[in-house]
């Protein structure tokens, strides 16, 4: 039985690491205008979120496999280090390409933090308490969602946008130290975990690096244990799709050869990934280290209806939430010309309802074990709320009122879909621990992919809508070759939210909101087919 102190330290470390990853996702929302104008590249500004979220998503499954081999604590600490390196690159960048590269590295580390924090958190408590643990982690996530843009806006206005990335360094270091000394398994030998690891590193025979056998073994581990072929195929496929969405209509015409190539080769690579993992590795009968080779994503996990439907519902919810949260801030920055700090306060209109929803769902789940009703309730709130969200016109009371239901929808779905996936794995399964890690990683992968596509799709819809309106307008303003120069002009010549140019920007933002409505409408069809399984509750609670 884990001691109270050990459990408390473990939970604190998980809350800090997850807060760190969530903070980095949303802190850049208020930087769109500043960085887009500074680097003269508003067309690719969506990659501030997408660059992070894409690498966050595609490597989520890899961290799950690494955790099976190296251990969850070790991988969680490594992911924090990688995340810090990415944050430092972003803070020191002097071009959009370098900044996006830093975001990609940070996303790689963040994927380990997000997936493994939930794995550790939900595995150190009983099944009927998982909802409470997910709530604690989700609240940490939601708080970061709320304060992140506010902190980003304050740094952007009073210091520099670079401090939005520097802030991750001390927080990450503090989380790393606590994690290094906390016990995530309850086993006594972990108390001396850090000194033993340092000693092992110091005493390692680095002469092995010069031997062919070392590199042969490394290659075999990468291919057979980590499924590097599957990682390359899936990450390349998703990246090409994202590049097509980002460059289409901005850098290249939609009917250009390179865009067609992106949208052709990308899906082909994803199909090859599915064929390799689901068919070739499963039927080949290959063995490594006396064990059957297991693909990164097994067909048993991906084809499980309960896991698939809940993960897709989570994907669509995160897709919609990214569109709504990012462009709610943009509405107040670009149309009403509020400072980044004041504009970011409006995110609390979504975050507070989401926080309340996660706590309510956790209570109901721990008491009654229900999951599916929370998902269905969430998607219905998402449909109605997203419809109201498209009516926001800048009035404070209206903005607050119309944000309640979308916030509740996100909070309900984010938590309940993870629980719905996890209950598909029974505790008496002989391979329970590994399957539990895989299912949690797959669910987190789907949600991160939703954030990635949401950020990219939002930028694409916004720029395309604005360009189409300007092309058919009769405004007496200079001709602009890019959206970023147009937005810079609107800032320098701002003449109120009712001006023709502000109305064009307002319409483009609302087109993004309509896309969020479509996501929730689609999520309804997956939500109603999620599993009806409940979490196990103790006999004492049932009485």
UniProtKB/Swiss-Prot annotation:
> Which Pfam families has this protein been placed in?
MFS_1
Record GO biological process: transmembrane transport
Provide a GO CC annotation, any one. plasma membrane
An annotated Gene Ontology molecular function:
xenobiotic transmembrane transporter activity
Q: Which residues form the signal peptide?
A: none
Chief localization class?
Answer: membrane
Q: Where in the cell is it found?
A: Membrane
Ranges that cross the membrane: 9-29, 42-62, 80-100, 104-124, 132-152, 163-183, 228-248, 256-276, 301-321, 342-362, 374-394, 400-420, 444-464, 509-529
Q: Enumerate the Gene3D superfamilies for this protein.
A: MFS general substrate transporter like domains (1.20.1250.20), Multidrug resistance protein D (1.20.1720.10)
Topology: which residues are Cytoplasmic? 1-8, 63-79, 125-131, 184-227, 277-300, 363-373, 421-443, 530-543
Residues on the membrane's Extracellular side span: 30-41, 101-103, 153-162, 249-255, 322-341, 395-399, 465-508
Q: Which UniProt keywords apply?
A: Membrane, Transmembrane, Transmembrane helix, Transport
Stated membrane topology is: Multi-pass membrane protein
State the function annotated in the UniProt record. Answer: Drug export permease. Multi-copy suppressor of loss-of-function mutation of GAL11. Involved specifically in transcription of GAL4-dependent genes. Can link GAL4 with the basal transcription machinery if GAL11 is missing. Confers resistance to 10-N-nonyl acridine orange (NAO) and in general to cationic dyes.
| The family this protein is said to belong to | Belongs to the major facilitator superfamily.
Its recorded name reads Protein SGE1
Q: What is the lineage of its organism?
A: Eukaryota, Fungi, Dikarya, Ascomycota, Saccharomycotina
């Amino acid at each position: 039985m884990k001691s109270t102190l050990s459990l408390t330290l473990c939970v604190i470390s998980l809350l800090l690491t997850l807060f760190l990853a969530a903070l980095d996702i949303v802190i850049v929302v208020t930087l769109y205008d500043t960085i887009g104008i500074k680097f003269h590249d508003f067309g690719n500004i969506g990659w501030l979120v997408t660059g992070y979220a894409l690498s966050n998503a595609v490597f989520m499954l890899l961290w799950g496999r690494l955790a099976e081999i190296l251990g969850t604590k070790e991988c969680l600490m490594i992911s924090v280090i990688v995340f810090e390196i990415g944050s430092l690159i972003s803070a020191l960048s002097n071009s959009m390409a370098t900044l996006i590269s830093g975001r990609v590295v940070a996303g790689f580390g963040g994927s380990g933090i997000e997936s493994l924090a939930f794995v550790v958190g939900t595995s150190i408590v009983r099944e009927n308490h998982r909802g409470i643990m997910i709530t604690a982690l989700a609240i940490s996530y939601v708080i970061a969602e709320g304060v992140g843009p506010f902190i980003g806006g304050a740094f952007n206005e009073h210091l520099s946008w670079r401090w939005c990335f520097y802030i991750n360094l001390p927080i990450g270091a503090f989380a790393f130290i606590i994690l290094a000394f906390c016990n995530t398994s309850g086993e006594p030998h972990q108390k001396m975990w850090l000194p033993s690891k340092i000693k092992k590193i110091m005493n390692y025979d680095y002469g092995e690096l010069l031997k062919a056998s070392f590199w042969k073994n490394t290659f075999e581990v990468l291919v057979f244990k980590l499924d590097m072929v599957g990682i390359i195929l899936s990450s390349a496929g998703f990246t090409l799709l994202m590049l097509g969405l980002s460059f289409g209509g901005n850098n290249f015409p939609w009917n250009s050869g390179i865009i067609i190539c992106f949208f052709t080769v990308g899906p082909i690579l994803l199909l090859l990934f599915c064929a390799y993992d689901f068919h070739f590795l499963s039927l080949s009968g290959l063995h490594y280290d006396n064990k059957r080779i297991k693909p990164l994503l097994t067909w048993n996990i991906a084809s499980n209806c309960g896991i698939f439907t809940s993960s897709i519902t989570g994907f669509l919810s995160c897709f919609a939430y990214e569109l709504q949260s990012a462009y709610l801030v943009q509405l107040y920055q670009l149309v009403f010309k509020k400072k980044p700090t004041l504009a970011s306060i409006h995110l609390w209109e979504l975050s507070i309802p989401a926080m309340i929803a996660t706590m309510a769902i956790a209570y109901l789940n721990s008491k009654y074990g229900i999951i599916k009703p929370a998902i269905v309730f969430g998607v219905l709130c998402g449909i109605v709320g997203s419809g109201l969200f498209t009516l926001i016109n800048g009035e404070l009371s209206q903005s607050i009122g119309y944000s309640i239901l979308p916030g509740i929808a996100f909070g309900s779905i984010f938590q309940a879909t993870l629980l719905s996936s996890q209950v598909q794995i029974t505790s008496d399964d002989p391979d329970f621990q590994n399957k539990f890690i895989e299912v949690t990683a797959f669910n987190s992968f789907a949600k991160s992919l939703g954030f990635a596509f949401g950020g990219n799709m939002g930028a694409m819809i916004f720029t395309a809508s604005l360009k189409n309106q300007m092309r058919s307008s009769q405004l007496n303003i200079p001709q602009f070759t890019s959206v970023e120069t147009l937005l810079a002009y609107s800032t320098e010549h701002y003449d109120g939210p009712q001006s023709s140019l502000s109305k064009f920007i307002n319409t483009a933002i609302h087109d993004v909101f309509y896309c969020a409505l479509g996501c929730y409408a689609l999520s309804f069809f997956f939500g109603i087919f999620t599993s009806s399984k409940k979490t196990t509750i103790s006999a004492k609670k049932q009485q």
